[in-house]
Design a protein with these regions (language model features):
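Short acidic DE-rich linear segments
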Residues: 2-8, 208-219
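N-terminal cysteine/histidine-rich coordination modules
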Residues: 1-82
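Long, contiguous alpha-helical scaffold regions
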Residues: 73-209
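Histidine (H) residue identity feature
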Residues: 21-23, 121, 194, 215
Length: 219
């Protein structure tokens, strides 16, 4: 099992969709940042999952299935833009390893967010619950605008959420440690009940089920 978690990649020839120039690109199957720490920086700076044409300077994100491993943070994150039988079989094999948090994402932004949450020693399950709470407080703003996304972010020791609106653009909502701890304590039993030792897609849909189920209990 350990061998399946070592950094590995394959070279693939891709054609620029704009000018047709052919490129030989390194596509990672496994990214083990415990073994190769620099790869984390490459992800966070949008260099690793990126197509860049030196001929016409065309750039675009390149999302493909890969496994992110950080043994120090005790987490594995599988990014699968499209689920298929081969990926399901691979995930089933990886799930035999116990005692490590396993997450499933389908895009680069969610992968980066999970990495940031883990690096700050926070629980992504708590973060997703807080997102739902904050969205509930933004109902008035959402009457004449569309919420596109909400993502965890931080600057040194200050936590926040970046809120992406269609018209207003990007806003920021602070997150205090005190409020995080309150939510963590309040929902710890519900979180445990809805968690399992397998690859979980922990997002706002997952968090919404917890809040809906426990609405009457806490109100």
């Amino acid at each position: 099992m350990e061998g399946k978690r070592l950094t590995s990649y394959a070279m693939e020839e891709l054609e620029c969709p704009k000018c047709g120039h052919k490129h030989s690109l390194k596509k990672y199957k496994v990214i083990n940042v415990t073994e190769k720490a620099k790869l984390k920086e490459e992800i966070m700076k949008n260099r690793l999952y990126q197509f860049s044409c030196e001929e016409c300077e065309y750039m675009a994100p390149l999302t493909y299935d890969s496994l992110y491993v950080d043994s120090r943070r005790n987490i594995m994150i599988y990014m699968a833009p499209v689920m298929n039988a081969e990926i399901k079989a691979e995930i089933a094999e990886l799930e035999q390893e116990k005692g490590i948090d396993k997450r499933l994402v389908d895009n680069i932004n969610d992968l980066k967010e999970k990495i940031m949450i883990a690096d700050n020693h926070l629980d992504d399950r708590v973060i997703e619950i807080i997102k739902i709470m904050y969205i509930d407080q933004m109902k008035k703003e959402m009457e004449d605008d569309i919420l596109l996304n909400i993502l965890f972010d931080y600057n040194r020791d200050n936590y926040c959420f970046l809120v992406f609106f269609q018209k207003k653009g990007i806003g920021k909502i602070p997150l205090t440690r005190e409020f995080y701890r309150q939510v963590e304590d309040k929902y710890k039993d519900a979180i445990k009940e809805h968690s399992m030792d397998s690859f979980m897609k922990v997002d706002m849909e997952w968090a919404g089920k917890i809040l809906f189920k426990n609405h009457n209990k806490f109100n």
